[in-house]
Amino acid sequence: MNIRLSAAFLSFAAFAGLAAAPSAQALTINPIFDSTVTSSTYVAQIENGFRTAAAVFTGNITNNATININVSWGYVAGQSLGTGGLGASSAYLYTNLPGASIQYWLTAAAASPRASKAESGSSKYLAAAVQADSAYKFALPTAEAKALGLVNPVSTALDGYIGFGKYQPYTFSGAVKAGTYDFVAVAQHEIEEVLGRISGISSANPSFLTPFDLFRYTAPGVSTHSYSALSYFSIDGGATKLAIFNNAPYGGDRGDFNGAAADVDNAFLSAGQTDNVLQDDFTILDVLGYTAIPGANTQPTPTSTQLIVAHLDVPEPGSLPLVAVGLAGLTLLARRKRAS
């Protein structure tokens, strides 16, 4: 059985100014396990599995930022995942931002001495992508704002929520057993979405875009925000296809991939399947403003799935979709709900 993944959003109406960052250079993911986790029979497995999932990011990203994530079992941001969900995420966003600001911040990050070749090279294509999407305002995840140094990077405020479906069979560590889902993989998918790997394209007429949407192409030099068109992730203006985005007619996040490679960012996860955190995943975070260690360790950690509570169309036969919930103006807004 495959499961679809997706993301949710919490939004802030205003954006804070530039904040000074302490000297230490290390990403910290701070999980806050709520009572749904601490009261579960699987509390130790959930907590250990989540920390294992987070370690691949904290061990390979050097930005000085602390990302605070509320972790729930059976719920996400207070909403039940029901009986069919694997995982879900919801991120806080700074909203109503002009594309020119996103371009400026990403370009500044790319000019940093700490920027990778991928990040530095990608910035030259941002102006054209922003121009192509000039009709839209942008939303910036608070976690990404921390990585870019735009707000206090060690703020204790929540950056997002992640929840895991409690009715699915999981393998919490080691080789994934037949008929079970890889918990670490699900967690990694969700964590990366809170960090910023999300799309604002939730319908044919999106209300906003995200920085990640600036790296979406249908052909060399042709940016897109289409919900249905076959599109791909590229950091060189569309010349090179690094991964194909999900455009399944039965749903799935448009910021996820279509499953052509065994990637943690895939929109669907099958029971018994082990996907991996690949180099392309670090490239995504790199161009979004994070700094990955050169040759970041892409150890064979199972792909993680992201599921958010929202309206989800009936998935393909034998598949479970992971979907996203939207939180607008600090109000939980259902975008898609996953069917089981």
Task: List each model region and its residues.
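Bacterial N-terminal signal peptides that target proteins for export
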Residues: 1-10
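Active-site micro-motifs of SAM-dependent methyltransferase domains
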Residues: 16, 193, 329-332
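Extracellular zinc-dependent metalloprotease catalytic-domain scaffold
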Residues: 26-188, 193-310
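A short, hydrophobic C-terminal helix/tail in secreted or cell-surface proteins
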Residues: 316-333
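Short, charged juxtamembrane terminal tails flanking transmembrane helices
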Residues: 337-340
